UniProtKB/Swiss-Prot annotation:
Protein name listed in UniProt: S-adenosylmethionine synthase
Cofactor note: Binds 2 divalent ions per subunit. Binds 1 potassium ion per subunit.
Gene label: metK
One GO location term (cellular component): cytoplasm
UniProt pathway: Amino-acid biosynthesis; S-adenosyl-L-methionine biosynthesis; S-adenosyl-L-methionine from L-methionine: step 1/1
Cited function: Catalyzes the formation of S-adenosylmethionine (AdoMet) from methionine and ATP. The overall synthetic reaction is composed of two sequential steps, AdoMet formation and the subsequent tripolyphosphate hydrolysis which occurs prior to release of AdoMet from the enzyme.
HAMAP family: S_AdoMet_synth1
Gene3D superfamilies xref list: 3.30.300.10
Residues binding Mg(2+): D19
Binding site for L-methionine: E58, Q101, D253, K284
UniProt KW Cytoplasm keyword: yes
């Protein structure tokens, strides 16, 4: 029987993809509120379609934010700035329907179960309960310098490169909507061996030929982004394989906040708890605990305690402490996983208020995460990407190893 290749594929999308437009609007609104009211509670959902933006959700804040202005500014910065694109930040209709956060939810967050039952620890970080129940995953692996899986890392880099060529005017026929997909072949030790297939679909104007698009994407994008040792004569390049891609963005497909959760995380290489990130303040553990889980996993791998590490956290609404912590190194750990769980409990504060304080999350830093991934970013400084707990982990493990 012929031996099959070991292949894994991940995708990314550009900032002009309709779902990412929605994510960026939701996070731009969150940032605008946090800039004036760091304790604001935000759950903001956005839908975009031809000529229309709909913003709904629950927001409780002492700040005033001109949501329509934030929406228009975000759309224009992405690149939807003229009527022929079918979506134009200058003149699209914007409908806003915002309520306050449910008082029932607010009560559970503001006064945790531990506080209500007089079980809180000595500090005040027990007072804030999780904003919902749920399970969250974090992951890290030594496939790239930023400790991310190679397929999603390359897919994001391709999309950032396409966007920079468009915004710099070097390829003036590019339009904002685009997608990339990278298939990596792995060797028998599950290490990246080569790139099997690269797919790029990018929106263009009607004047450019398919041959010109293909040449530009291969020479100016793929070969500039993907290290040459991964490319060979058998690597397949599929450039705009559907043919014409002129109609795109919200004119081509409606977009919705929270529909690109695999693009946002690990490209399917690790598990996902199901909760989206964008438009949510940091009392929502869908977001903050996912960031914390990545922070934990990355520090474990950076400490040399495992080649790869997956963390699961789980919470109950209104309860400060996580109901479970799981560490899975897929057989690559240098110490027992029980010891790693113990180290995690002692080195990291995984209560919602503890996460917010540990990572300094009450800041307007989230719009920049809403395109090109929340993890493994080398172009922006994100606190959950820091590896400042490496020495604490090493010390704890060395002092408690049997």
């Amino acid at each position: 029987m012929k031996k099959e290749k070991r292949l894994f594929t991940s995708e990314s999308v550009s900032e002009g993809h309709p779902d990412k437009v929605a994510d960026q609007i939701s996070d731009a609104i969150l940032d605008a509120i946090l800039a004036k009211d760091p304790d604001g509670r935000v759950a903001c959902e956005t839908t975009v379609t031809t000529g229309l933006v709909l913003v709904v959700g629950e927001i409780s804040t002492s700040a005033y934010v001109d949501i329509q202005s934030v929406v228009r500014k975000t759309i224009l910065e992405i690149g939807y700035n003229r009527p022929e694109l079918g979506f134009d930040g200058n003149n699209c209709a914007i409908l806003v329907d915002i309520d306050e956060q449910s008082s029932d939810i607010a009560d559970g967050v503001n006064e945790s179960l531990e506080t209500r039952e007089n079980q809180q620890d000595k500090d005040d970080l027990d007072k804030i309960g999780a904003g919902d129940q749920g399970l969250m995953f974090g992951f890290a692996i030594k496939e790239t310098p930023e400790l991310m899986p190679l397929p999603i890392s390359l897919a994001h880099s391709l999309m950032r490169r396409v966007a920079s060529l468009r915004k710099e005017g070097r390829l003036d026929w590019l339009r904002p909507d685009a997608k990339a997909q990278v298939t990596v072949e792995y060797d028998d030790e599950n290490k990246p061996k080569r790139i099997d297939t690269v797919v790029i679909s990018t929106q263009t104007d009607a004047t450019v030929s398919n041959d010109e698009i293909r040449e530009a994407m291969i020479d100016m994008v793929i070969k500039k982004v993907i290290p040459s040792q991964y490319l060979d004569k058998d690597t397949k390049f599929l450039i705009n394989p559907s043919g014409r891609f002129v109609i795109g963005g919200p004119k081509g497909d409606s977009g919705l906040t929270g529909r690109k959760i695999i693009v946002d995380t690990y490209g399917g290489y690790a598990r996902h708890g199901g909760g989206a990130f964008s438009g949510k303040d940091l009392t929502k553990v869908d977001r903050s605990a996912s960031y914390a889980a990545r922070y934990v996993a990355k520090n474990i791998v950076a400490a040399g305690l495992a080649y790869q590490c997956e963390i699961q956290l789980a919470y109950a609404i209104g309860v400060a402490h996580p109901v479970s912590i799981m560490v899975d190194t897929h057989g690559t750990s240098k110490v027992s996983e029980d010891l790693l769980v113990e180290a995690v409990r002692n080195v990291f504060d995984l209560r919602p208020a503890g996460i917010i304080e540990m990572l300094n999350l009450k800041r307007p830093i989230y719009r920049q995460t809403a395109a090109y991934g929340h993890f493994g970013r080398t172009d922006v400084d994100l606190p959950w990407e820091h590896t400042d707990k490496v020495e604490a982990l090493k010390t704890y493990v060395s002092e408690h190893a049997e």
